[in-house]
């Protein structure tokens, strides 16, 4: 039998910001992995933009911080995602 997960509304809202709408059978770890993959994609794009000269080095750290703020789920343990 597959586990059914009941997510806190705050977690569902954050997942929706990233285009994710979990099913009851979607495990927190699967969802965290998907969010992490999105973050990794965006951080690589940011790095590539920096290397292409889109912005100066002094702005890179600030942009990384702003990107990280869009992914608060990565700092919340998955054990706290469900009721």
Question: What do the PLM-derived regions correspond to, one by one?
Answer:
Residues 57-66:
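Short, charged, amphipathic alpha-helical segments
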Residues 25, 52-57:
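Charged, low-complexity interaction regions
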Residues 39-47, 67:
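Non-transmembrane amphipathic alpha-helical segments
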Residues 1-35, 78-83:
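Long, non-catalytic architectural segments outside compact domain cores
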Residues 69-81:
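Amphipathic alpha-helical coiled-coil segments
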